[in-house]
């Protein structure tokens, strides 16, 4: 079991604001000292989500900040995210844990 996440946990969501892109939000947050970044976009096409999430994942790795993907276990695995955040209608926890492995965050 992973330890609890503490500190400032940022969720990038361009559906609740349209002034900044996911990437701009992540860059500003990293510069500001954020502790965790979660990529969240429920409407984006898979190929576009992959490109953006992969870029943010690399930025987070360089900054030693955990990167979480919202809802999408497939995307989390594809970009080697540190974890996945599951909602009520997403893949069941047991299956997500099996796919993600014991060293990743599943919540």
Go through each PLM region and give its residues:
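Conserved N-terminal beta1-alpha1 strand-loop-helix module at the mouth
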Residues: 1-91, 98-106
């Amino acid at each position: 079991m992973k330890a609890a996440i503490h500190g400032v946990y940022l969720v990038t969501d361009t559906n609740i604001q349209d002034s900044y892109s996911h990437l701009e939000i992540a860059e500003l947050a990293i510069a500001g000292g954020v502790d965790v970044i979660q990529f969240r976009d429920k409407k984006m096409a898979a190929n576009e989500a992959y490109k953006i999430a992969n870029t943010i994942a690399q930025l987070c790795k360089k900054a030693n900040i955990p990167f979480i993907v919202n809802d999408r276990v497939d995307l989390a695995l594809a970009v080697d995210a540190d974890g996945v955040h599951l909602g009520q209608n997403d893949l069941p926890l047991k299956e997500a844990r099996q796919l993600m492995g014991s060293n990743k965050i599943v919540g």
